[in-house]
Design a protein with these regions (language model features):
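Residues that scaffold the ATP/ADP-binding catalytic core of kinase and kinase-like folds
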Residues: 29, 59-60
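Active-site gating loops and adjacent loop-to-helix segments of metal-dependent hydrolytic enzymes
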Residues: 60-96, 123-127
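Active-site loop-helix segments enriched in His/Asp/Glu that coordinate
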Residues: 88-134
Length: 134
């Protein structure tokens, strides 16, 4: 059970909220409740956030474009590097990168993600045999 001094519920902020969790699911929410022995106590409780715009593959580019040379680097040079990088990624590598990024988001408290990627074809431009590959 979780006891929150304040919790943001669908109807707005509530005080003294006790949440019952059974089998990993919220089964009861009680307002103006009293904490019970063994409750996890928090001062404020919010719903988990959603990341509405993720490019998980860019996590694997971290460090490749951290410094720019004045007058030589721009959004367009970054974009060219990104597409060259994508040309080398396999579906298995994309899956591993996304698994890491999604795990990091979950650990940070995100509950959902809207994922966008630029990989729709194999390196060289041919379509994947399995259209569900990417």
């Amino acid at each position: 059970m979780i006891f929150a001094e304040r919790a943001l519920l669908p109807g707005g902020w509530a005080e003294q909220v006790r949440i019952t969790v059974t089998g990993g699911h919220i089964t009861e929410v009680s307002k103006a409740a009293a904490p019970q022995p063994g409750d996890t106590r928090v001062s404020a409780l919010l719903p988990a956030l959603s990341n509405l715009h993720s490019h998980a593959f860019q996590r694997a580019m971290a460090g490749m474009t951290e410094h720019r040379i004045a007058g030589r680097d721009s959004f367009w040079t970054w974009r060219d590097l990104m597409y060259r990088f994508l040309d080398r990624l396999t579906p298995a590598q994309m899956e591993a990168i996304a698994a890491l990024v999604f795990m990091e988001m979950q650990e940070a408290g995100y509950a959902a993600v809207g994922e966008f990627h630029y990989v729709h074809h194999q390196p060289g431009g041919d379509a994947y045999a399995d259209i569900a590959e990417l």
